[in-house]
Amino acid sequence: MSQSPSLHQLQELNPFLRRHLGPDATEQQAMLNALGIASRNELIEQTVPPDIRLNRPLDLPAALDEQAALAKLAGYAEQNQVWTSLIGMGYHGTITPTVILRNVLENPGWYTAYTPYQPEIAQGRLEALLNFQQMVIDLTGLPLANASLLDEATAAAEAMALAKRVARNKSNAFFADEHCHPQTLSVLKTRAEGFGFELIVDSVDNLAKHSVFGALLQYPDTHGEVRDLRPLIDQLHSQQALACVAADLLSLVVLAPPGELGADVVLGSTQRFGVPMGYGGPHAAYFACRDDYKRAMPGRIIGVSRDARGNTALRMALQTREQHIRREKANSNICTAQVLLANIAGFYAVYHGPEGLQRIAQRVHRLTFILAAGLEAKGIKRLNQHFFDTLTLNVGGAQAAIIESAEAAHINLRILGRGHLGVSLDETCTEQTVLRLLDIFLGVDHGLEITALDQLALPEGIPASLVRRTPFLAHPVFNLHHSETEMLRYLKQLENKDLALNQSMIPLGSCTMKLNATSEMIPITWPGFAQLHPFAPAAQAAGYKAMIDELESWLCAITGFDAICMQPNSGAQGEYAGLMAITRYHCSRHQPMRTLCLIPSSAHGTNPASAQMAGMEVVIVDCDNDGNVDLADLKAKAHAAGERLSCLMITYPSTHGVYEEGIREICDVVHQYGGQVYMDGANLNAQVGLARPADIGADVSHMNLHKTFCIPHGGGGPGMGPIGIRAHLKPFVASHPVVPVPGLDPNNSAVSAAPWGSASILPISWMYIAMMGPQLADASEVAILSANYLASQLGAAFPVLYRGRNQRVAHECILDLRPLKALTGISEEDVAKRLMDYGFHAPTMSFPVPGTLMVEPTESESKAELDRFVEAMLAIRAEIDEVQQGNWPAENNPLKHAPHTLADVLGVWDRPYSLEQAVAPSAHVRQHKYWPAVNRVDNVYGDRNLFCACVPVEAYR
């Protein structure tokens, strides 16, 4: 009889599970042994409160292997019909240069990095973002730009908030041109609702009739009209109001920059700079403003500073103005935004350079001119006198026949009322595209030829007064890398400066830097997902609908909620969307007075900022000495609020890294007083398969798909923050003005520009759940095991600040460095910088408690990597002891000088510790050395000498 294993024995039940989990069964058992317990189940019983446990498998389909999951998802992609979409409205066909596609978008060195809070190990993407800012500064004609926002519509809402904060006109009204994109107007409506602003949507011809603190103008407008904005801007300035302009970035290559026309704020999308439409996202918005408003600007700003040796170094500037610092005083809850996509757009400009961009923009405009000339020659009336790439046409009774012809040619046009059609050309269009359009509008026997039309002496589409005269992108970085060889090497040089997950663990607490598996990432560039316009007819997006519906059903099964709203395109947007749904719910019950939001003192800064944006008054609830919500204080404040109580925002497990025993009672108290419970989903990775937010008592919660469900952080975005909702809140979530959500009131205004947010990255989370199935619980259990293992190994050297039941932590733990700082002067920042010399990104610094490090290892890190981190931390503790014992001076030791660079090696060495101790402090580092690009960055200098544009090349030498 054969002794070889049977086919059944050789068939793995869940082959992806062992790829996703870092520690194998043997390593897990060794970690359990170190904790003095026998099994993972015993650990979970000791850690998770029994009254919230989900004591059954998740109701999910059995896990698929990688090939089967890819095949099923490919079937969905094939159901999507990729037509030529000439709808416009802020979304356009574009060509992603393949050198950027392969070496940035598909490169884990770029997409697995985190927000550059530790600039010494992020100089590559900081330089890329500085390039992005310089591109925006040059094209808009304004002196200051940020490093991206979420999308054009939310950027417009941010502009409105900025205008209210800084304008001298104290009106409570904001004006929006009725010819702005409809999705932008909808998001403005939502934001104005939360802030209590009056939003006036009207013709710009009536602007002078209104007293406003600011206005939004579209350039060119949604129908393609290129209007001289100077008279409108002068009118606004005469009443001390701000002029905000939403501008098509490619058009600014040939149009006069809005800054030169007098605009105070310019914003828009960079999607058509090489970023696929992706059924709505993700795309990087841009935002530029006058220098006077720098402290009111939303989002991250990259600035130039210097390091400890005086060399040029980049960093995130003016961070004290951000939401996590200003909390309930913030005008914005924007956290990180769309860094990966901003980098792609910036690299698109680097690769093409000013001449390349001019060629692209002029070609798009010329094709549009030729189309306009042909249609005009045959009597079709154009409604916009001037244009860049968009024509709005009056075709009268021929509209239906033209639409039918366009559909037969697989071309999507913008369908407007009253016999009007819109057509927007883009970089992907050719002469053949124009000929097909002439056939569609005029019939195949029109007799027109492209060459002849190109030679017609007709009025130009852009008036002479609005032709761009100002040079742009003169900096060398936009003029040196136009061959693929040079571009490839430039991208690699930048990548090598950064530390990402493809090199080492990133143990950032509250960030869940887990594996972003290759099989999860591959589908996002498939044309069936990448090339769809978000406003394409539903029949062309059947595959997207099937995939999203299935993902929503899975997320409901995982969380216990009744429905999912996919529109929020970040975690902070999810918070805002959920709170707005709560506000609308209370108003529907004739309880508009319910505006008070209770938030624990430990909450992330986005929580109070989001509540303030939703029109709520924030009341802080104390935490006790164990880091838990003070139940007595909660009860007292809920009672005091009474009928004014709107909701409680709470993170679970808590931001202190423990499962609070009283979470059910906390929810019950809020419900007793008529409030709703908003559960921040930042720590959902410690709940999946073990507990469900809705079962615990949450009414609404956002899910960070870029944490728990494997969408990569991209160096600071993209992300997705869909919300799960109980049935009673479902009628009040965001809909969309262009693609209404079935079953919702179409008057429910939007929170994001696209109906399903950043839809093209949803396949990542779909793949993760499809390949894990009910074994998602294993990921949560191993994440908890890894965190407890680190706590046990490090607790003697660095006290763990908070522990839960049985002295266990959840999926992360807080190491308290304050006693050591008091003894030695060595701070949490010194330890964070010294970890770079050991090849690690630091844990989260000083959140949620100043003077601490919060460590989250995730389930994806092997025991060997965890042990390497433990070795590094214990070695650092030994170095601190050397300082404490007086063997090294308090200000002249490896921690105070960290990180160490090649410049230190090449310079004069006169420090009281060896060069080897400085740059090669462990055996692993001696074999796998990562060199920080700069020494410690001087933050104070950078803010006092703010400079947020590209510096001369000589500065890097």
UniProtKB/Swiss-Prot annotation:
It is an enzyme of class 1 (oxidoreductase). CDD domains: GDC-P. It catalyses: N(6)-[(R)-lipoyl]-L-lysyl-[glycine-cleavage complex H protein] + glycine + H(+) = N(6)-[(R)-S(8)-aminomethyldihydrolipoyl]-L-lysyl-[glycine-cleavage complex H protein] + CO2. The modification N6-(pyridoxal phosphate)lysine is found at residue 707. One of its GO terms (biological process) is glycine decarboxylation via glycine cleavage system. Keywords: Oxidoreductase, Pyridoxal phosphate. Its EC number is 1.4.4.2. One of its GO terms (cellular component) is glycine cleavage complex. InterPro entries: EF_Hand_1_Ca_BS (IPR018247), GcvP (IPR003437), GDC-P_C (IPR049316), GDC-P_N (IPR049315), GDC_P (IPR020581), PyrdxlP-dep_Trfase (IPR015424), PyrdxlP-dep_Trfase_major (IPR015421), PyrdxlP-dep_Trfase_small (IPR015422). Its cofactor is pyridoxal 5'-phosphate. Signal peptide: none annotated. GO terms for molecular function: glycine binding; glycine dehydrogenase (decarboxylating) activity; pyridoxal phosphate binding. It holds the Pfam family GDC-P. The glycine cleavage system catalyzes the degradation of glycine. The P protein binds the alpha-amino group of glycine through its pyridoxal phosphate cofactor; CO(2) is released and the remaining methylamine moiety is then transferred to the lipoamide cofactor of the H protein. The glycine cleavage system is composed of four proteins: P, T, L and H. Belongs to the GcvP family. This is Glycine dehydrogenase (decarboxylating) 2. The gene is gcvP2.
